[in-house]
Regions:
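Active-site pocket-lining/capping segments in soluble small-molecule metabolic enzymes
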Residues: 2-122, 140-144, 149-231
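Conserved nucleotide-cofactor-binding alpha/beta core module
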Residues: 125-126
Length: 236
């Protein structure tokens, strides 16, 4: 574990990237214009990604790129093109959900650090150890875990464990919800969740019955660090 857990901030575009870096983030995560779980964001151009990475590295900030949607065989050639661009840019890690894509990355770029996306729903030590065997370097733990479960996973794996400390909570289990797909044909696992859970569904007279309160653990950072958490993730 590092002396201090990193603060990992989202960068949906250039303005957000600069704000995160100038406000003290240790690392940022960002997506290209395709194959990431925030399709609605501005995102980044693969042609200018090397300059973006260089700007961050010059300020001591790590850059992780999200390629964390499920990908079909038809889309694989374009995904490989994006992967090549990401690797050439010198990023510090790539987040994936699809295990098949993880295998391709490990074969094609064996030294490129692999990060397991929250969409993998890693919720126990067995799952974390499986990823470790596959060569993953960092894992985003499921939001639904207790502090005891987080501590057990952190203690039982050599991977760096990443935990969300601020952002939304899913009414389902993170990465497993189909509500947006069913109601609006917008898949959360393809980066297009419409968050229909935020609508005013009623149950027994209670409004917004599916809309959870947002997550905030900003008053628990020291406690999380003591559990072995290596990265505090802010949702983007």
């Amino acid at each position: 574990m590092e002396k201090h857990a990193e603060i990992l901030a989202p960068a949906g575009g250039e303005a957000q990237l600069r704000a995160a870096v100038l406000c003290g983030a240790d690392a940022v995560y960002l997506g290209l214009r395709g194959f990431n779980a925030r399709a609605g964001a501005e995102n980044f151009d693969e042609n200018t990604l090397p300059q973006t990475v260089g700007w961050c590295h010059a300020r001591g900030v790590r850059v992780y790129v999200t390629l964390n949607t499920l990908v079909t065989d038809r889309e694989l050639p374009q995904w490989l093109h994006s992967l090549d661009a990401v690797a050439a840019a010198g990023v510090d890690g790539v987040l994936v959900q699809d295990l098949g894509l993880a295998k391709i990355i490990r074969q094609r770029y064996p030294t490129l650090p692999l990060h397991a996306s929250t969409q993998m729903t890693i919720h126990n030590l067995a799952g974390a150890r499986l990823l470790e065997e596959m060569g993953f370097a960092q894992v985003v733990l499921a939001r639904e875990l207790s502090k005891e479960e987080i501590a057990a996973i952190c203690a039982g794996t050599s991977m760096r464990c990443e935990v969300f400390v601020h952002g939304a909570l899913c009414m389902s289990v993170s990465g497993q919800c189909y509500l947006s797909s069913v109601l609006g044909e917008r898949s959360g696992n393809r980066g297009r969740c419409a968050q229909p859970c935020r609508l005013d569904f009623k149950s027994h007279g209670r409004g917004y019955a599916l809309s959870l309160k947002d997550l905030t653990l900003t008053d628990r950072l020291r406690e999380l660090e003591a559990l072995g958490v290596a990265s505090f993730k802010i949702e983007g």
